[in-house]
Amino acid sequence: MSIKSNKTEILGSIRSILIACIVLFSSSQIASAQRTMKGQYHLAAEAAFAADPRVPAGAEISFGAYLLDSYVIGWINVTPDFVTLPTDHQLGYIPINVGADYMYRVAATRARSVNLYVGGGVFLGWELYDPFRKVPSYIDTGFGKGNLIYGMAPAVESEFFIARRLALTLGARMPVSISSKTEILKLHIKAGIRINI
């Protein structure tokens, strides 16, 4: 065998490998459009962070389904926070909410491997006041043990598919708690994973 024929064989092999990679990449991009197809169910687990960095992170779990150009979800979240009392003590509280959202896709890559959604929904929950009994007992907070809360929550969310059934999520929700004794508006930043099932 001559050096020229070896070089030709090597170049041919490299060309074949490159063509195979291009075919695999393009087919995976086309297939990723099916990741958000109508009727596809998904589960998500996300950490929820308050706008104030001193507040510990909460958590959210959701189950939903993609529609033609949107998705719907049902969720439950727990998001601790605190308010400062007139006595300068901090009253911790934990809202525990269940809710439902409708999210409309406003932007996406052609293959839908990156999507941006805007929407919102409604929620119902219970606000638990001073769950760890950090406020001295002689101080009357006027809050009681807890309070029923409800309202609506506009939201924005992006998803970045890193595998056929796995996406990273990043978003924000601003619950408007009509009956809350602590805060009417409260911004949460969410980040987590979503698994298509």
Short names for language-model regions:
Residues 39-41, 53-59, 90-98, 112-114, ...:
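Residues that define the transmembrane beta-barrel architecture of outer-membrane proteins
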Residues 50, 105-107, 177:
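Short beta-turn/strand-loop junction motif enriched in small, turn-promoting residues
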Residues 62-138, 162, 166, 195-197:
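Gram-negative (and chloroplast) outer-membrane scaffold detector with strong preference
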Residues 71-75, 152-197:
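Predominantly the C-terminal beta-signal and adjacent terminal strand-loop region
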Residues 137-138, 144-145, 150, 194:
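Short leucine-rich amphipathic alpha-helices used at interfaces
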